[in-house]
Amino acid sequence: MMLERAQNLIAAALAAGRAQGAKPLAAVVVDAGGHIVASAREDGATIARHEFALAKAWSCVALGLDTRDLVERVEANPAFFSAAATLFSGRLLPAAGGVLVREDEQILGALGVSGDAAEVDDACAIAAIGR
């Protein structure tokens, strides 16, 4: 994941939030190893939003799926999530707003967005990715 691409994804997610009238957002892009490449927090976003966005992005690359899909899996198999949450020291966040960044089917990283309702966060992340 290149820095310029990560910054562009963040700018696109925040712009999508502004266009939708979302509450102030935070956005984080991680590489395929879960390391932060870029992040931003809008003025007025609460202090926890960056951590939520990071957890969403990290969850995507850790499990290889978007967090909206993780929500469905948690509901279908809560015992798995409980075990995974313990294994990963609570770093998994089953809340929509995290999307994988792929190129030619290869996972490059993920974008996590937080600040509004999970559905709004997810819409902003999806808009940024261009799906």
Task: Locate predicted features.
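Flexible, solvent-exposed loop/hinge segments and secondary-structure transition points
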Residues: M1-R131
